[in-house]
Amino acid sequence: MMQRHERPQAASHPRADALRYDDNLTTERPTFVSHLECAATGERYPADELHNLSRAGKPLIVRYDLDGVRTALTKEALTRRAPDLWRYRELLPVRRTGDIVSLGEAVTPLLAMPKLSARRGAAELLVKDEGRLPTGSFKARGLVMAVSMAKALGVSHMAMPTNGNAGAALAAYASRCGIRSTIFCPQDTPEVNVSEIALQGATVYRVNGLIDDCGKIVAEGKAKVGWFDTSTLKEPYWIEGKKTMGLELAEQLGWQVPDVILYPTGGGTGLIGMWKAFAELEAIGFIGGKRPRMVAVQAAGCAPMVRAFEAGVEHALRWEDAHTIAAGIRVPQAVGDFLILRAVRESKGFAIAVEDDAITAALDEAAREEGFLMCPEGAATYAALKQSLADGRIRRDEQAVLFNCATGLKYPLPPVHRTLDRTKPIDFAAL
């Protein structure tokens, strides 16, 4: 039996009057990128040039001089920095502050869910609420880094496929720095997402297909008109933005890691990025060797990673007829499938699929019991936790962290039909 975790002291941050709000965006700090590396072959590529996939057709990973980072960055130094994503500058790829494109990427809260924990008999259930980020989702982490690096490397036109939230983030950050953006989304993408993308300056098209069909259009356009393909894992810097979830989480837990992380998995950059973050934190002496078990959560209507994990293979076949209410994880085939599966297996975690009915029930329960409106993808992680506690894959004495990847306000909400006629007598006892 594991010992219960001692609740960590909250990380101290500077007083509001101790430094300017934009200190992390204007203070030049040393950067330590050494090179890029093919995730499959290990082939090295120069860091300060524009890249998509490696020659092997696989994602490129940013590597750092971690000995240099270890010398330059201390935990104590972090306590004197403003609480935003850019506080970890030594572990990020943007070299010049002038290239940072920011909309205020604040550290997102880690919220206890005591009622849900008690209901499930779980030791400690925490949710990292990524809906507090610009454009209302964790896609802001990846796209702020991708766009900042695109600006640094002279890109003038970016294109991408999206199920909604990533497109909104690209549109916002690209407009912020004057880069043109063209975005393609499936025909059934919610109107609120498409309108948000268009309002923030992108040219957006609905496509009669799924996100990978949209991706094919982006790839064809790259060859024909030369825009930069910003598809998930087809450029190196989304992962670097997403890994800040792991950096933040470890700091919020007093430089510890939880027992289990449940992560809504489509393209998987966040899961891959956090796994990278924990390795880098250990290398610079900020955490020990313990790792959380990484759980890739998918919808039963689109679960290529679950199928590949259970089959014991390294790559996932395309999932045909993909469908789920959690559109953000409706990704039939992921470029980084082998990296997702590698992280899950190395961590001794697992992949799990949940039905749409279970997602809806989890969303309703979190809102009703905790006053916390999750997005469907985030609710999928709570549904997966319930399922895993019931079947024993997660023990009740383990500390579990769920990721709510967007605000629930960006999604269609159920209608409310109750009305009251003010001109008639009101039976207040019946209200």
Regions inferred by a protein language model and the residue ranges of each:
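Cationic, low-complexity basic patches in intrinsically disordered or flexible, solvent-exposed regions
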Residues: 4-7
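Short, low-complexity intrinsically disordered segments enriched in A/P/G/S/L with frequent Arg
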Residues: 11, 17-20, 25
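PLP-dependent amino-acid enzyme catalytic core
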Residues: 24-431
